[in-house]
């Protein structure tokens, strides 16, 4: 009886020792940055991978929206020096970038759902 208990305990310890690192690796999703974006997209397979990429694009869209707002404010201040058109053009550019980033985030969220359904 002691021997069976010892073997079961040893087996459980061995199983835990091998499963724990695997579970931790699966639970850790790397943060997507400018530096690893291409690699993250190329290696994305799980819903968590695509959600991390979508979060990156959400941040990029928010940054672009902030730049657009900055240039809209600058346009109202730049009217006296004749630079309002340039500022408005930059605001439109950043609005377009924000829209594209939102579309990319939406696409990766759709891929996350597809990866989660096994298709």
PLM feature spans:
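Short E/K-rich amphipathic alpha-helical oligomerization segments
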Residues: 35-41, 62-89
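Amphipathic alpha-helical coiled-coil segments
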Residues: 91-116
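Positively charged n-region of N-terminal signal peptides that target proteins for export
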Residues: 1-4
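Short, charge/polar-rich alpha-helical segments
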Residues: 39-65
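Short, charged, amphipathic alpha-helical segments
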Residues: 51, 55-58, 84-99
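Short N-terminal segments immediately surrounding and downstream of signal-peptide cleavage
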Residues: 24-45
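Bacterial N-terminal signal peptides
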Residues: 9-19
